[in-house]
Amino acid sequence: RLIRLDLSEHTSKQEVLLAVKQYSETIEEGEWVIGEGWNENLWDQAEPIFASELDQYVPNHPVMLKRVCRHALAVNSLGLSKANITEDTECPPGGVIEKDEFGRLNGLLKDQAQDLLFNVLPDVSEGYLRKALHAAIKDAYKLGLTGGHTEDLNYYGGFRQTYEAFKQVI
């Protein structure tokens, strides 16, 4: 939440779509837009975000928006294409690739189907890890915390890269 697009405070689909559009204008064309925390249950109209809507607002970036529960993603058409997800792609065991009433992809991936997209995301760079660590430390200090620990040394592509980032930042 500290360095990615935080969608948890938005109270409507329109707000989320505008935030995604604005964020996309701050990054290089073609770079992934990754947002987290949308929750349609807090909106006046409890309807999820669909690929067609994301396509209208952000046509030149692949978009992946994680729902607050982490059990669903909203993905635009470019993101689905990068993951080679088509109308013929079978749902993986334990996952759902949602389609509309006409059998077309609607951009929602649930549970294990999310892995189809996660597998094509660019690897996290050491620079990104350093930026994330700096943001986390700054936030901890702001909250009055002076120490902490992590259990995620392998979360971002392996122990070595994460450890090197820690050594440089701390």
Go through the PLM ranges and name each one.
Residues 1-170:
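Divalent metal-binding segments
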